[in-house]
């Protein structure tokens, strides 16, 4: 499997629960390296731009409102098969359907307040990483 990078966001609900460290431990325990990280409180414009792919969907406004409701922790993860590995760690979008031991099963409250975001493919990972991190701010270790 190839070394990949993926974007991960710890959403406002999980940041408010003070579980950033527990989530980071899961990333690292799965062999993923955190090669860039920053905390931010997204503006409405940034959240709308980042989630523009969902603009026509009925949940778009609620998603944007949620993502600007508090600070988020944004990180780039790197490792063998990082995209799929992170998605496995996150679990199903709906925490009620997520397997026990996944981030969403353990820390999410609802399908809307679902604790984390992760890129779903190499192409989207590249776009999402570039959105938050200029190349000079991502460091392989």
Swiss-Prot record:
Q: Which GO terms describe its cellular component?
A: cytoplasm
Q: Which GO BP terms, alphabetically?
A: CTP biosynthetic process; GTP biosynthetic process; UTP biosynthetic process
PROSITE patterns documented for this protein: NDPK, NDPK_LIKE
In the UniProt entry, which residues are flagged as the active site?
117
Q: Which CDD domains does the annotation name?
A: NDPk_I
Q: State where the protein is found.
A: Cytoplasm
Residues that bind ATP: 11, 59, 87, 93, 104, 114
Q: Which domain of life is it from?
A: Bacteria
Reaction equation(s) it catalyzes: a 2'-deoxyribonucleoside 5'-diphosphate + ATP = a 2'-deoxyribonucleoside 5'-triphosphate + ADP; a ribonucleoside 5'-diphosphate + ATP = a ribonucleoside 5'-triphosphate + ADP
Enzyme's top EC category: transferase
Q: What is its EC number?
A: 2.7.4.6
Q: What keywords are annotated for this sequence in UniProt?
A: ATP-binding, Cytoplasm, Kinase, Magnesium, Metal-binding, Nucleotide metabolism, Nucleotide-binding, Phosphoprotein, Transferase
Listed cofactors: Mg(2+)
- What GO molecular function annotation could you give as one example from this UniProt entry? ATP binding
* Major localisation: cytoplasm
Protein family (similarity comment): Belongs to the NDK family.
Q: What does this protein do?
A: Major role in the synthesis of nucleoside triphosphates other than ATP. The ATP gamma phosphate is transferred to the NDP beta phosphate via a ping-pong mechanism, using a phosphorylated active-site intermediate.
Subunit structure comment from the entry: Homotetramer.
Q: What is this protein called?
A: Nucleoside diphosphate kinase
Q: Which gene encodes it?
A: ndk
